[in-house]
Curated annotation (Swiss-Prot):
The gene is nuoD. GO terms for cellular component: plasma membrane. The lineage of its organism: Bacteria, Bacillati, Bacillota, Bacilli, Bacillales. GO terms for molecular function: NAD binding; NADH:ubiquinone reductase (non-electrogenic) activity; quinone binding. NDH-1 shuttles electrons from NADH, via FMN and iron-sulfur (Fe-S) centers, to quinones in the respiratory chain. The immediate electron acceptor for the enzyme in this species is believed to be a menaquinone. Couples the redox reaction to proton translocation (for every two electrons transferred, four hydrogen ions are translocated across the cytoplasmic membrane), and thus conserves the redox energy in a proton gradient. PANTHER family: NADH DEHYDROGENASE [UBIQUINONE] IRON-SULFUR PROTEIN 2, MITOCHONDRIAL, NADH-UBIQUINONE OXIDOREDUCTASE 49 KDA SUBUNIT. Its main location: membrane. This is NADH-quinone oxidoreductase subunit D. It comes from Bacillus mycoides (strain KBAB4). It catalyses: a quinone + NADH + 5 H(+)(in) = a quinol + NAD(+) + 4 H(+)(out). Its EC number is 7.1.1.-. It comes from the Bacteria. It is found in: Cell membrane.
């Protein structure tokens, strides 16, 4: 008689494929995962509570450290919430700089995902190529704001600095270069039989399940749901750009891959149009007081980050600090479906599924 024995196995919190301090406790029977329990909180810093004792401008650097792979979108959602409460009109040049910064950040974020996800399942070369192109974007953003990762660039009313001389031309030159590299990425990976066997039909869920788990971003669109806040609830100046929203059909790891790769192409379209439409002159910061006091009341805004729908709720009592600040962090919500996806799966597919969800632990823990 064959007897099997279940075993508990810890993945993390210091495992290279969790990309941060994330612990996953799995119960396995042979090669099959019977149960998976995420353990989070190792990177919790109490950002929302700290914000209650900070001025609005002082909170911006804290947002950089949530989704540190896409800090510009975090900067923006906070500023956008305060601007909504103050009914501020943002200078046009500042809006274009914001869009350029956010879309460059989106491309850089997806490049990190592409390279590390493939490295985790055994492909080393794509990781090197992805970081080569990401370094070019980081250099562009560094020229713009002086930082490489935690940018602290946006302000309530606009941005801190104007683009330096020649910066727009460099961004313009980057777009065709990146498109050419994308073709190489697809030649290298997207048709590779070994890769396709690792991702097709793995980690499948339906549109109904995605919605019930509050998934967003590529994790939602891979099921065929056409939902992108840049298109469906345009903010900033996104209604001025012509771009598509990539969607999948089967909701597996392959569709999530395709959605993110196509999103890079769409971001390049937006960058190209923003460069062409970029105002020749103008202010980059609205006339706002040095110490900002949002009027009494509350506001909630949401935007599309590389990981999905990030929201910011502010309750103000008219002081220079928020009475209450709350972020809707997409990585936290996207993580919730992981136990369901892993149950009954072969342990060899664990890293493929985890990588496909694309979480950032600073955003999960807040």
């Amino acid at each position: 008689m064959i007897r099997t024995e279940e075993m508990l196995l810890n993945v993390g919190p210091q495992h290279p494929s969790t990309h941060g301090v994330f612990r996953l406790v799995i119960k396995i029977d042979g090669e099959i995962i019977k149960e998976a329990t995420p353990v989070i909180g190792y990177l919790h810093r109490g950002t929302e509570k700290i914000a209650e004792s900070l001025q609005y401008t002082q909170i911006i650097p804290y947002t950089d450290r949530m989704d540190y792979l896409s800090a510009m979108t975090n900067n923006y959602v906070l500023c956008h919430a305060v601007e909504t409460m103050m009914d501020l009109e943002i200078p046009e040049r500042a809006e274009y700089l914001r869009v350029l910064a956010m879309e460059l950040g989106r491309v850089a974020s997806h490049l990190v995902w592409w390279g590390t996800n493939l490295l985790d399942i055994g492909a080393v070369s794509p990781f090197l190529y992805a970081f080569r192109e990401r370094e070019m974007i980081i250099n562009l953003l560094s020229e713009l704001c002086g930082a490489r990762l935690t940018f602290n660039y946006m302000r309530v009313g606009g941005v801190k600095w104007d683009a330096p001389d020649g910066w727009i031309e460099k961004v313009k030159e980057f777009v065709p270069y990146m498109r050419e590299q994308l073709e190489g990425y697809h030649d290298l990976v997207s048709g590779n039989e070994i890769f396709l066997n690792r991702v097709k039909g793995v980690g499948v869920y339906s549109a109904e399940e995605a919605i019930s788990y509050s998934l967003s971003g590529a994790n939602l669109r891979c099921t065929g749901v056409h939902w992108d806040l840049r298109k469906d609830e345009p903010y900033s100046i996104y209604d001025r750009f012509d771009f598509d929203v990539p969607v999948g059909s089967t909701g597996d790891a392959w569709d999530r891959y395709v959605c993110r790769m196509k999103e890079i192409e769409e971001s390049l379209k937006i960058i190209e149009q923003a460069v062409e439409q970029f105002p020749k002159d103008g202010a980059v910061l609205a006339k706002v007081p040095k110490i900002i006091k949002a009027p009494k009341g509350e506001a909630f805004v949401r935007i599309e980050s590389p990981r999905g729908e990030i929201g910011c709720y502010i309750a103000s009592d008219g002081k220079k600090e928020p009475y209450r600040l709350k972020f809707r962090r997409p990585s936290f919500y996207n993580l919730q479906i992981l136990p369901k996806l892993l149950k009954g799966e072969n342990i060899a597919n664990l890293i493929t599924i985890l990588g496909g969800v694309d979480i950032v632990l600073g955003e999960v823990d807040g």
